[in-house]
Amino acid sequence: MAATAPKAGGSAPEAAASAEAPLQYSLLLQYLVGDKRQPRLLEPGSLGGIPSPAKSEEQKMIERAMESCAFKAALACVGGFVLGGAFGVFTAGIDTNVGFDPKDPYRTPTAREVLKDMGQRGMSYAKNFAIVGAMFSCTECLVESYRGKSDWKNSVISGCITGGAIGFRAGLKAGVIGCGGFAAFSAAIDYYLR
């Protein structure tokens, strides 16, 4: 941006102001996008949003509690329990062998027997889903806290740890397969959701 020469008959202050305008513009650019740019705290009120007061100590304490690994694990445990129970009841509902007595195959099961089997299967699925959800969520939170990053590697590492821990109950080979399978599943879900 070259400064234009002052017109004939123009005053000296006008010529100086026109020469300084590009200079002020370039200084402004340095503060906005250049080397002198600094991080700014953007308040919602300055952006046209609703201004919010500063957070109280109670609000900060509640936020810290809700961001803790224990809370995340408990939330995943409860969510897994509910989802697992619903999944167990659903699968028991479509299973044709619910309430089936192998001693008397021609007898029709009563509603009480069918509901009892559905409840048992729902509770079994609920417990398993709750344990897996709590283990995965807690492990992912701990890995994220240790690494200091929130990326796809956290879910893969925690998936491997969770799958390996579940699989090691059946032996070393099952633990390695569980580690790889759960890590691959976690990576696929993380890739699909992000």
From Swiss-Prot:
Identify the GO cellular component terms for this protein.
TIM22 mitochondrial import inner membrane insertion complex
InterPro entries, per database record: TIM22
Name the membrane topology term: Multi-pass membrane protein
Disulfide partners: C69-C141, C160-C179
After translation, the protein is modified as follows: Disulfide bonds promote efficient assembly of the TIM22 complex.
- Tell me one GO biological process term: protein insertion into mitochondrial inner membrane
Pfam families recorded for this chain? Tim17
Q: Where is the signal peptide?
A: none
Q: GO molecular-function annotation terms? A: mitochondrion targeting sequence binding; protein transmembrane transporter activity
Q: Which UniProt keywords apply?
A: Disulfide bond, Membrane, Mitochondrion, Mitochondrion inner membrane, Protein transport, Translocation, Transmembrane, Transmembrane helix, Transport
Task: List the transmembrane segments.
Answer: 74-94, 123-143, 170-190
Q: Where in the cell is it found?
A: Mitochondrion inner membrane
The entry's function note states: Essential core component of the TIM22 complex, a complex that mediates the import and insertion of multi-pass transmembrane proteins into the mitochondrial inner membrane. In the TIM22 complex, it constitutes the voltage-activated and signal-gated channel. Forms a twin-pore translocase that uses the membrane potential as external driving force in 2 voltage-dependent steps.
Please report which protein family the annotation says this sequence is part of: Belongs to the Tim17/Tim22/Tim23 family.
Q: How does it assemble?
A: Component of the TIM22 complex, whose core is composed of TIMM22, associated with peripheral protein FXC1/TIMM10B and the 70 kDa heterohexamer. In most cases, the 70 kDa complex is composed of TIMM9 and TIMM10 (TIMM10A or TIMM10B). A small fraction of the 70 kDa complex is composed of TIMM8 (TIMM8A/DDP1 or TIMM8B/DDP2) and TIMM13. The TIM22 complex also contains AGK and TIMM29. Interacts directly with TIMM9, TIMM10A and FXC1/TIMM10B. Interacts (when oxidized) with TIMM29; interaction is direct.
* Protein name listed in UniProt: Mitochondrial import inner membrane translocase subunit Tim22
